[in-house]
Amino acid sequence: GHISHWHHELWANGYSSRPGRSLIPTLLGASQCAQGQPMPLAINPPLAAGGGSDRNAIPGYSFDNTHVVNHRLTVMPIRTSAMRALGAFANVFAIESFMDELAHASGQDPLQFRKLHMQDPRSLAVLNAVVDRSTWWHLPKAEGVGHGVAWARYKNTSAWCAVLARVQAGETLRVLQLDVAVDVGRVVDLDGVINQTEGGALQGMSWALKEAVQFDRTRITTQSWADYPILRFSEVPELKIHVLDQPEQPSLGAGESVQGPVAAALSNALFDALEVRVRNLPLSQDHILQALNAPN
């Protein structure tokens, strides 16, 4: 089977309230003065300019019918701002996790199911490259070990990225290996591309496994590193970056293509290991236990 209709809705604020983009003061402190200016609405640029919350909400697949709706929220008790990759992180996580769910629901291999819906040759090339160059993807898996795959083209106009994840899953998730393939067009600085991709992959892994800002109806309640854990050096997996040089193609940015695919690949690997789907980030012990104990 194949997908005939795809419907995606999201609800989000704008992402940028930085100083210098408004006719009135936008420093947070200015809104707290006795006669200060109210904070302006955060900017959310149109998708044609790269988008904000809706970045990568349009899937990179060829479906017969695609319907994407972005609901712009204008009221929030706390200020929102930019995050690396903006909405691409959440949207790619959602799209690639659900593609995995659909593959399993239809009894198809997740990798082949993706290829069934792909027509862009460079998308196929980056996905094939990460699989072909991986030394572990086709190896037998021990109990509790899972493999996951995800990919995206950043902004649907920039760099291509595909990720394979190998995890050991139980009440907690341990990442054993990550393989990443990227196509940034003509490579000007190979070390720079590798460094950006490695750093982005580890940051995406930290977001996916650990990071969460807590808040109530009026304020952020997360106060320190004690209640905002991040990835530690001891948790860094074996990480391999495979760069596809395209010397005849324009160069593309390398810094924000990998975060979303990493999160989705980890989620899909967790499902492969435990056969339970964790749909809420981070993929923490609490969320894994909730999924394991949820009624079928």
Located regions from the model:
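Cofactor-binding beta-sheet edge motifs in enzyme active sites
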Residues: 2-296
